[in-house]
Amino acid sequence: DHVGRNLVTEKYGRMMASTAPEDFTKNIEPYIPRLSEERAARQEQVIAQQVAWAKDFRERYPKLGEAMRALTTTEDTPSATSFETYLRGELGTYSDQTFERYEAMIGERAAASPQRNITEETLLHTVQLGGFDTLDEAEAAQR
């Protein structure tokens, strides 16, 4: 970014808070910007919404869901990072302005009736790129 941060390195470093906490505390945390409590709390609200949507998607499309990352931070290992942890690392690198826009997008989707599940929307576009018309069609094609 414009102040010299390597955002990709920082994102993966932030994920280490869960996957390798001792290394994170010693070798990463002192060198990356600390998030305010308010920002961290707002991020956790966004993360909770997205994890709920991913869980809902997996329940409705279990075969497609099998190909996804582990869902929650409690499932992290040193070699496997969950969707929740990955998202936390990603959002932690966003500027305040970018995060505010992302937060608003998630809020708009959550407030819609019915809600617009971003996991479902993303996976629908993905399976359409693979030649399927619908998620149901893609789910049925899985073995």
Regions found by a protein language model. Name each.
Residues 1-12, 46-47, 91-107:
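Short, structured motif recognition centered on aromatic/hydrophobic residues
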Residues 13-16, 25, 29-32, 36, ...:
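Residue-level detector of alpha-helical secondary structure
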Residues 35, 40-58, 143:
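N-terminal hydrophobic signal/anchor transmembrane helix of membrane proteins
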Residues 49, 123-124:
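EF-hand and EF-hand-like helix-loop-helix modules
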Residues 54-69:
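Terminal low-complexity "docking" segments
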Residues 68-90:
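Eukaryotic low-complexity, mixed-charge intrinsically disordered interaction/regulatory segments enriched
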Residues 111, 115-121, 138:
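Short, surface-exposed polybasic-aromatic patches that bind anionic ligands, especially phosphate groups
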Residues 125-132, 137-142:
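Solvent-exposed beta-strand motifs enriched in subsets of small alpha/beta binding domains
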